[in-house]
């Protein structure tokens, strides 16, 4: 969990440094304002995760996935990091038969199937937010430190 905490801290610091290093003329642009708002939101939504990691309240499987994302992102293996994110977000659960053909009206009772069994970590709102912010950090890292095109993943 220490690796995950330090990766999050380092990514947020790098993002903040990247924003403050921008030209003053750029601060008026809408794109810059949007990115600054994304940074603030990410920092805010990641607080519960950082607190839970510090207090040891995060599930071992989630810590493993987050560590995998942090390691892959740190080594600029962004495709692997995104795959680890997808496994964390939706898991490896196969879709039920015919789920691609479900219409709006079929949904009424279908949501009760398997009720009670948590399918993936995104069922909790706070967890959903910080998992999405982890993906945002990977996207920032990919923009900030792009992979060398001569080295294929």
Residue ranges and their predicted role:
Residues 1-51:
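Acidic, serine/threonine- and proline-rich intrinsically disordered low-complexity regions
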Residues 13, 17-20, 24, 54, ...:
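Generic surface-pattern signal
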Residues 29, 33-36, 57-60, 121, ...:
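Short, solvent-exposed segments of well-ordered alpha helices
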Residues 37-44, 57-62, 74:
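Helix-boundary capping/turn motifs
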Residues 51-57:
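Extended amphipathic alpha-helical scaffold segments
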Residues 64-153:
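Predominantly eukaryotic Lys/Arg-rich, low-complexity intrinsically disordered regions
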């Amino acid at each position: 969990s220490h690796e995950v905490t330090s990766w999050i801290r380092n990514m947020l610091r790098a993002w903040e440094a990247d924003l403050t290093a921008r030209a003053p003329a750029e601060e008026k642009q809408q794109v810059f304002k949007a990115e600054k708002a994304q940074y603030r939101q990410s920092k805010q939504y990641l607080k519960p995760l950082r607190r839970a990691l510090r207090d040891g309240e995060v599930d071992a499987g989630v810590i493993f996935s987050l560590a995998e994302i942090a390691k892959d992102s740190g080594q600029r293996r962004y495709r692997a990091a995104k795959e680890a994110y997808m496994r964390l977000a939706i898991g490896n659960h196969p879709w039920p038969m015919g789920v691609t053909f479900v219409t709006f009206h079929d949904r009424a009772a279908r949501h009760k199937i398997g009720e009670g069994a948590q399918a993936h970590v995104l069922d909790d709102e706070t967890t959903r937010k910080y998992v999405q912010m982890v993906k945002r950090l990977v996207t920032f890292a990919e923009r900030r430190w792009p992979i060398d095109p001569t080295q294929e993943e």
